[in-house]
Amino acid sequence: MSTRSVSSSSYRRMFGGPGTASRPSSTRSYVTTSTRTYSLGSALRPTTSRTLYTSSPGGVYATRSSAVRLRSGVPGVRLLQDSVDFSLADAINTEFKNTRTNEKVELQELNDRFANYIDKVRFLEQQNKILLAELEQLKGQGKSRLGDLYEEEMRELRRQVDQLTNDKARVEVERDNLAEDIMRLREKLQEEMLQREEAESTLQSFRQDVDNASLARLDLERKVESLQEEIAFLKKLHDEEIQELQAQIQEQHVQIDMDVSKPDLTAALRDVRQQYESVAAKNLQEAEEWYKSKFADLSEAANRNNDALRQAKQESNEYRRQVQTLTCEVDALKGTNESLERQMREMEENFSVEAANYQDTIGRLQDEIQNMKEEMARHLREYQDLLNVKMALDIEIATYRKLLEGEESRISLPLPNFSSLNLRETNLDSLPLVDTHSKRTLLIKTVETRDGQVINETSQHHDDLE
């Protein structure tokens, strides 16, 4: 006759032996066996009753029990009180006490491990609280500090962008005004150039008139000289003719005086001389008057042409001076326009560089914000994982508590006193035969989590008959 006692702990299934690290699992099974039932046959033989505890996140239990089948090898045998061997009870009690002692030692070890496990859970809870406090502090400080810095820098960037935009608009307005001034000056320059060309053409025509007048004056001077020479020649010829006539008259007068009493020719000659002199004086006076009138006309035309030429020269000099002044102004405006365009290009380049720097700063701040968000999300995931671990640990603690309460209730049950066992005479033929059937109902509940979120949950029922 032998008694078998098998005891296993869910803590070992969960965490291994004394030197094995704890690894949580999503499905946990707990098996505890103990000697609780006895069957009567030809001799008193203990049988075992197994209780299977299967825990899942919902805490479901399945039991398997062995019924007692009473059989007798010899029909009609009677069990009498005198045929019972009470020494067997002492052996059973001794072995039961040893088993209880072993169970107490194992329960003490389990209690020590459970205390260590609770200390670890408390330490993890403290770490969880510290992480939560750090997370809240990071949320508060990071949001306020980075938000204020980001807003302040964005306001400064917007202010600088607005200032640069205003400067750019002002420079563009100045550039447009300068372009309009340049266009107006160019139009004025074109008009002045046209007027200059007209003045030059007028001056050229005046020069042609002056040349013509000079030629006419020279021609008139030559004519005057020729007329003077002709007058001198005619006068000389007239004088010679007069002398010849006088000589002839004297010769005739002498001859007449000598020959006959001649008429008085002196008066006739005097009259002829007077006539010729009057005609010569008249011709000379007319020639002088014509010459003087022509000379006066030519002098007046020359003076008029000289005045026009002088005025044209003055206008040409004035136009030339205006052209030089406008050319200097155009050159100065071109230099100013080039300097303004260069400044505008430099400002555009500086604005582009500053805008690129601001964009880089904004991108860097956004990356920092994204990193902070990712870090916060990581802390939240760790916190959720810790919460899941805590929930699993709470479930295991509750399971341990139920197991301990079951063990305590089982230990507190009174033991049967075999010395006072009263056996009655029983006819084994009249006892019904009870077959031993074991029914096992197993509920498997599987929960899959990812990043602290339940993504799948399944439940399975299994009914086995043995």
Curated annotation (Swiss-Prot):
Keywords: Acetylation, Cell membrane, Coiled coil, Cytoplasm, Cytoskeleton, Glycoprotein, Intermediate filament, Isopeptide bond, Membrane, Nucleus, Phosphoprotein, S-nitrosylation, Ubl conjugation
Modified residues (N6-acetyllysine): 120, 129, 139, 168, 188, 223, 235, 294, 373, 445
Region entry Coil 2, spans: 269-407
Residues modified to Phosphothreonine: 20, 426, 436, 446, 458
Intrachain S-S bonds: none
Residues with Phosphotyrosine modification: 53, 61, 117
Region (Coil 1A) residue spans: 96-131
Residue positions of motif [IL]-x-C-x-x-[DE] motif: 326-329
Subunit structure: Homomer assembled from elementary dimers. Identified in complexes that contain VIM, EZR, AHNAK, BFSP1, BFSP2, ANK2, PLEC, PRX and spectrin. Interacts with BCAS3. Interacts with LGSN. Interacts with SYNM. Interacts (via rod region) with PLEC (via CH 1 domain). Interacts with STK33. Interacts with LARP6. Interacts with RAB8B. Interacts with TOR1A; the interaction associates TOR1A with the cytoskeleton. Interacts with TOR1AIP1. Interacts with TOR1AIP1. Interacts with DIAPH1. Interacts with EPPK1; interaction is dependent of higher-order structure of intermediate filament.
Family stated for the protein in its record: Belongs to the intermediate filament family.
Domain notes: The central alpha-helical coiled-coil IF rod domain mediates elementary homodimerization.
Protein name as annotated: Vimentin
